């Protein structure tokens, strides 16, 4: 359960804060100043995402230390794989938060939309109940749920001591979903409104 809780912490750190980022600038009126600069929107979105990725890696370090100090649990597998998985999940959630922020008009709307999707992603990820016990129609959704890939891979690395080959499928899925969402975040940002 401890490795799977990393997913919830990653959602909170890298999902909610970016969801509030651009929409707070819209409310304050500072987005107009950014829009008139000659900065490419890829650079702008990347500049918005990098601080959340760095913060996420710091939080993963704190979580690993707390798991060791409080519960006496240390990862059996490679710690670098844990950081790789966490980085890929933070790519997804920070991009998803920026997508929501791009489409939202105010902070309340952004938070409610993010909350709606986070609850669904957690419930359908296999964190609390095994994915195999879900009805087949619902089980299909785990193939597009990055949290389920993250939890499976974290359990494999953290508890079973799996190597990169044992989680290559999950890493590839997280990378593809994260890149898709990152591209969507850039494309959904409109400099001219």
Map each language-model feature to its residues.
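Long, hydrophobic alpha-helical segments
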Residues: 2-18
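Membrane-interfacial helix-loop-helix junctions in multi-pass membrane proteins
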Residues: 74, 125-180
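Alpha-helical transmembrane segments and their short interhelical loops
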Residues: 41, 45-115, 119, 165-171, ...
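A residue-level signal for alpha-helical anchor/packing sites in multi-pass solute transporters
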Residues: 21, 30, 64-65, 69, ...
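Transmembrane alpha-helical core positions of polytopic small-molecule transporters
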Residues: 8-13, 24, 56, 60, ...
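Short helix-loop-helix connector
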Residues: 35, 39, 104-105, 129, ...
């Amino acid at each position: 359960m401890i490795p799977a809780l990393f997913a919830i912490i990653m959602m909170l750190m890298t999902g909610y804060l970016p969801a509030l980022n651009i929409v707070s600038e819209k409310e304050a009126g500072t987005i107009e100043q950014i829009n008139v600069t000659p900065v490419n929107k890829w650079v702008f979105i990347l500049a918005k995402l990098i601080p959340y990725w760095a913060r996420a890696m710091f939080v993963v370090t704190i979580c690993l230390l707390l798991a060791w100090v409080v519960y006496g649990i240390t990862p059996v597998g490679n710690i670098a794989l844990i950081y790789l998985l966490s980085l890929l999940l933070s790519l997804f959630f920070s991009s998803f938060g920026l997508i929501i922020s791009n489409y939202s008009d105010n902070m309340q709307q952004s938070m409610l939309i993010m909350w709606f999707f986070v609850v669904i992603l957690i419930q359908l990820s296999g964190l609390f109940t095994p994915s195999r016990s879900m009805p087949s129609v619902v089980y299909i959704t785990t193939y597009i749920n990055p949290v389920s890939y993250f939890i499976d891979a974290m359990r494999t690395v953290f508890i079973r001591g799996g190597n990169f080959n044992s989680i290559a499928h999950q890493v590839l899925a997280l990378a593809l979903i994260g890149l898709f969402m990152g591209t969507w975040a850039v494309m959904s940002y409109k400099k001219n409104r």
